[in-house]
C-alpha cells in the first residue's frame, strides 16, 4: 500500500463542523470547543451551504492578539482565511500532503466532482495513516531517514533495557 493509492476519501472526516459567514468569532470558538477541533468551515446561508472559508485556531489567536474587543463581534466572513483550498476526494494522500506543504496549511476541505463539500482532511489524519502503516513512513520521510530512525529507536530501546530497567526493578514491590 502506498500513499499514491490511498485516496483522500478514506482518510477524511465526513462530519465537518460549519458556521455561517455572518456569525462572529465567539460562535466559531464555541463550535471548536464543543467538538474539540481546531477549525470550522465557513459556509453561506443559502440552501447549498457553500463553503467559502475556514476559521482556524491561528485565526482566533491573530484576532485576540490585537486586543480589539470589536473584533469579537466582526462577522466571520471578514476574519476567515479565504479563498478556501479544496481537494477532490479522489485525490491521493500524496496529493493532499504536497498541497498542504505548498500552501503551508494543515487542513483541506474535501469536495466531490460537483465541488460539494464531503469532508475535511487534516495533517493529523495523514499522520494517523502513516502511524497505522509503517511502510508509508519511509515513503514520506525517505528510506535513509527511516532506517536511521529505526536504528536510533532500537538503540534507545536497548539503552532502556540495559540502564533503566535494572534501576526500575530495584523499586519494584516483591510479590
What are the roles of these predicted feature ranges?
Residues 1-14, 56-88, 92-102, 113, ...:
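Tandem CBS (Bateman) regulatory domains
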Residues 15-18, 50-51, 86, 116:
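Short, flexible active-site loop motifs that bind/organize anionic cofactors or intermediates
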Residues 18-37, 42-44, 87-104, 111, ...:
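The conserved cystathionine-beta-synthase
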Residues 32-35, 40-59, 100, 108-124:
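A glycine-centered beta-loop-beta connector
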Amino acid at each position: 500500500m502506498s500513499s499514491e493509492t490511498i485516496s483522500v476519501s478514506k482518510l477524511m472526516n465526513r462530519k465537518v463542523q460549519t458556521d455561517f459567514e455572518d456569525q462572529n468569532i465567539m460562535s466559531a470558538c464555541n463550535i471548536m470547543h464543543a467538538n474539540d477541533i481546531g477549525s470550522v468551515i465557513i459556509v453561506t446561508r443559502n440552501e447549498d451551504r457553500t463553503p467559502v472559508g475556514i476559521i482556524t485556531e491561528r485565526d482566533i489567536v491573530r484576532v485576540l492578539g490585537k486586543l480589539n474587543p470589536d473584533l469579537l463581534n466582526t462577522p466571520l466572513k471578514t476574519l476567515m482565511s479565504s479563498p478556501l483550498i479544496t481537494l477532490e476526494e479522489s485525490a491521493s494522500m500524496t496529493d493532499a500532503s504536497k498541497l498542504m506543504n505548498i500552501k503551508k496549511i494543515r487542513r483541506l476541505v474535501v469536495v466531490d466532482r460537483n465541488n460539494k463539500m464531503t469532508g475535511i482532511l487534516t495533517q493529523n489524519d495523514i499522520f494517523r495513516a502513516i502511524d497505522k502503516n509503517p511502510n508509508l513512513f519511509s515513503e514520506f520521510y525517505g528510506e535513509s531517514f527511516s532506517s536511521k530512525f529505526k536504528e536510533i529507536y532500537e538503540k534507545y530501546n536497548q539503552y532502556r533495557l540495559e540502564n533503566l530497567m535494572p534501576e526500575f526493578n530495584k523499586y519494584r514491590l516483591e510479590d
